[in-house]
UniProtKB/Swiss-Prot annotation:
Reported function: C-mannosyltransferase that mediates C-mannosylation of tryptophan residues on target proteins. The reaction occurs on the luminal side of the endoplasmic reticulum and involves the transfer of a mannose unit from a dolichylphosphate mannose (Dol-P-Man) donor to an acceptor protein containing a WxxW or WxxC consensus sequence. C-mannosylates RSPO1, a Wnt signaling regulator, preferentially at the first Trp residue in the sequence WxxW. C-mannosylates the netrin receptor UNC5A, preferentially at the third tryptophan of WxxWxxWxxC sequence.
This protein's GO CC annotations: endoplasmic reticulum membrane
Family from the record: Belongs to the dpy-19 family.
Domain notes: The C-terminal luminal region is essential for C-mannosyltransferase activity.
Designated gene of the protein: Dpy19l3
GO terms under biological process: protein glycosylation
Keyword terms of this UniProt record: Endoplasmic reticulum, Glycoprotein, Glycosyltransferase, Membrane, Transferase, Transmembrane, Transmembrane helix
Name of the protein described by the UniProt record: Protein C-mannosyl-transferase DPY19L3
Stretches assigned to the Cytoplasmic side: 1-43, 183-184, 198-215, 231-239, 280-289, 324-338, 438-465, 500-522
């Protein structure tokens, strides 16, 4: 039975100064909800404004680039053949498969034509979905055929608008990455504006629309944004899973759309390896990211009909090596400073050796030689011996694969980007060095200190990741100009993050003993705002001039050539010539090619060198036999190659062929002593004299100021 009794008297509890009294607590309870609600409201409002600005600036960038493309070519007014010719070199080759899919009677026949293609390389049937990264063209062609837009939008506009739309995604992803790092969307706005004002050095989409990197880099930027968020500490399990999904999807799409994906992700894996080794990143999160890279590559490999070049990539070998060695090498992150250093050096050596061992084993098992030209090029580029290899020299002599020109930094400095970037880089490198030393030192005493007080110098994992990322991609850009677009876009993100980062300004103010929250707040907002105002003042007149400058596509010689081929040659005719021109022939005429610009195949590289003997010192009988061995009916000679002056002596195409053939080069200057004079004159020059020995094998059927087309006789 329940009773009610008098409550026992209890002693009053002394309230500490750190805790409010009951009366004060009641007052706080009345105040907190409104304060929390107000803070939450401003946070939601700020996020809404920041998100709206991100979408707007992404769309504006897309429209801006599309307008520049239209103004430069007058794309809406030129003929279809001129539009297709404007897709130069390999861009035209990729677009031709989009066109091929649209022209196929059914989607099934279109797929069959790509899987069993016999027009891209004569006398061969190749699987284009295995050889090339063209799933994006397949996807777009399917969308165009399925969606009810044929009456309102031409296929070419659907294609280019998709690419310009991806630029909006790209800029938005850069914006979000900078916002995540700094904690303010003002940083994202500054990053996006820097990207636009440094357009010459951050993108080339407006004049190389179908290029693989223009498809891939937006997904790469999304992946970096997702990784930046994933590396934040104390994420909720649901947020972590959703972020991992975003990383997986973006990594997969990046891998699917660009053949150089494995090299970019190898640098990312190195970033993770460095941070994990220096204890600046949670080991489990690094493991997740290694696993995502491997699984995405294997999935792409499956979709590309088990492309052996993917299986033999250094990335897969490296990631497997890291995971294996880390499992075998126990207690890697314990001990004194010197002990940790020795363990780390051993770890590096084991991973490096195991990577080379696994990669060599895989390549021998698969008999993989498709990527050997890349390693020959790298070996020659970094001074590990001269080479006469035609393919390696072809890359070495291209400006795009040379060192980054110094005038790039001059242009980047005009918008203050380079100055801001170097300022932030120096501060964060010093911070990272201190943190790395702290982590590698004897951890027992330092960890006890951390339990009582926060470190004076610290670097968040997401900031550390972006720091090492920008350093490694900077080294890549400095060594190979073509890769600068990977660095300069991230440079915008990193510089804007630093200017808006409270951690960066706090560290600097501490050094001069002027640190307080108000000064930090003023600097992190005042400096970016002043920079934004300067950018608007400096760049607005130039942007207006660009938008008002109207040009027009003009290439009458190439238009005349394509029109003649369409009207005067059989549809099954086989054409030989330069890789760049033949891509246009494939797109504009649908004729069969002997070779093309997609260079990631050993047999194709050998065939290209054989076809290029038309610019070497070879007899007409030799050239005729080589061309006929590939089923050639017509050969196109270009004066711009035969009499080339763009490159210096030793880098002209005819010089590369002469050296590869063991012949002395033309023109003033010395040749290597073991090179000998050729027995025959240069074919592309001598054939124009119409001598009997040439006329017996080649008949000129077309000529203009740029091109000469010869029909091959079928006699042996």
């Amino acid at each position: 039975m329940m009773y009610i009794r008098q409550r026992k008297e209890t002693k009053p509890i002394e309230v500490s100064e750190d805790f409010p009294s009951p009366k004060e607590d009641v007052k706080l309870e009345k105040k907190l909800p409104s304060g929390c609600a107000s803070g939450r409201f401003w946070k939601i409002l700020s996020s809404a404004v920041g998100g709206t600005v991100a979408l707007c600036i992404g769309l504006l960038t897309s429209v801006y680039l599309a307008t520049l493309h239209e103004n430069d070519l007058w794309f809406s007014n030129i003929k279809e053949v001129e539009r297709e010719i404007s897709f130069r070199t390999e861009c035209g080759l990729y677009y031709s498969y989009y066109k091929q899919m649209l022209q196929a009677p059914t989607l099934l026949q279109g797929f069959h034509g790509l899987i069993y293609d016999n027009k891209t390389e004569s006398m061969r049937t190749i699987n284009l979905l295995q050889r090339m990264n063209i799933y994006q063209e397949v996807f777009l062609s399917v969308l165009y055929r399925v969606l009810p837009i044929q009456k309102y939008l031409e296929p070419v506009y659907f294609y280019i608008y998709t690419l310009f739309g991806l630029q909006a995604v790209y800029v938005t992803a850069l914006y979000i990455t900078s916002w995540l790092l700094s904690g303010t969307w003002l940083s994202g706005l500054l990053a996006a504006l820097w990207y636009v004002t440094n357009r010459i050095d951050t993108t080339r989409v407006e004049f190389t629309i179908p290029l693989r990197e223009n498809w891939a880099l937006p997904f790469f930027a999304i992946q970096i944004a997702a990784i930046t968020y994933f590396l934040r500490p104390n994420l909720q399990p649901l947020s972590e899973r959703l972020t991992l999904l975003a990383i997986f999807v973006s990594t997969f799409l990046f891998s699917l759309t660009w053949q150089f994906n494995q090299f970019m992700m190898l640098l990312q894996a190195l970033v993770l390896f460095i941070l994990d080794s220096l204890d600046m990143l949670p080991a489990m999160k690094a493991t997740w990211l290694y696993g995502i890279q491997i699984s995405c590559l294997l999935l792409v490999c499956t979709l590309q009909f088990f492309n052996s070049m993917i299986l033999g990539s250094l990335l897969i070998s490296f990631n497997l090596s890291v995971l294996i060695v880390r499992k075998l090498q126990k207690n890697l992150k314990t001990g004194s400073f010197l002990t940790r250093i020795w363990k780390l050096l051993l770890h590096l050596l084991l991973v490096f050796c195991l990577t080379l061992f696994l990669n060599n084993i895989i390549k021998k098992v698969l008999n993989l030689k498709s990527d050997e030209h890349i390693f020959k090029f790298l070996k020659a580029k970094f001074g590990f011996g001269a080479t006469r290899d035609f393919d390696a020299n072809l890359y070495l002599c291209e400006e795009a694969f040379g060192l980054l020109p110094l005038n790039t930094f001059q242009r980047l400095s005009e918008t203050l980007l380079f100055y801001a970037y170097m300022f932030v880089l120096v501060v964060t490198v010093v911070t990272a060095s201190v943190v790395a030393f702290h982590n590698l030192s004897d951890s027992t005493s330092l960890k006890s200190m951390d339990q009582t007080r926060k470190r004076a110098v610290d670097l968040k994992p997401e900031a550390a990741y972006n720091l090492i990322h920008t350093i490694l991609f900077g080294v890549l850009a400095l060594s190979t100009m073509r890769m600068k677009y990977l660095w300069t876009s991230h440079m915008c993100v990193f510089a804007s993050f630093g200017l808006c980062s409270s951690e960066v300004w706090e560290l600097l103010l501490r050094l001069v003993h002027l640190c307080n929250p108000k000064r930090i707040w003023v600097l992190r907002y005042l400096v970016p705002v002043l920079t934004l105002l300067y950018l608007c003042y400096k760049s607005w007149p130039g942007v207006m001039d660009e938008l008002s400058e109207l040009k027009e596509f003009y290439d009458p010689d190439t238009v005349e050539l394509m029109t003649w081929i369409n009207s005067n040659t059989p549809r099954k005719a086989v054409f030989a010539g330069s890789m760049q021109l033949l891509a246009g022939v494939k797109l504009c005429t649908g004729r069969t090619l002997t070779n093309h610009p997609h260079y990631e195949d050993k047999s194709l590289r050998e065939r290209t060198q054989a076809v290029y003997q038309i610019y070497a010192k070879r007899s007409p009988e030799e050239v005729h036999a080589l061309l006929r061995s590939f089923g050639t009916d017509f050969v196109i000679l270009e004066d711009s190659i035969c009499y080339e002056r763009r490159h210096h002596r030793g880098c002209r195409l005819r010089d590369l062929l002469d050296v590869a053939n063991g012949h002395e080069m033309d023109g003033p200057g010395e040749s290597d002593p073991d090179l000998r004079p050729a027995d025959h004159p240069r074919f592309c020059e001598e054939i124009k004299r119409n001598l009997p020995s040439y006329a017996a094998h080649f008949t000129r059927v077309f000529q203009n100021k740029t091109f000469h087309v010869y029909k091959l006789s079928r006699n042996k």
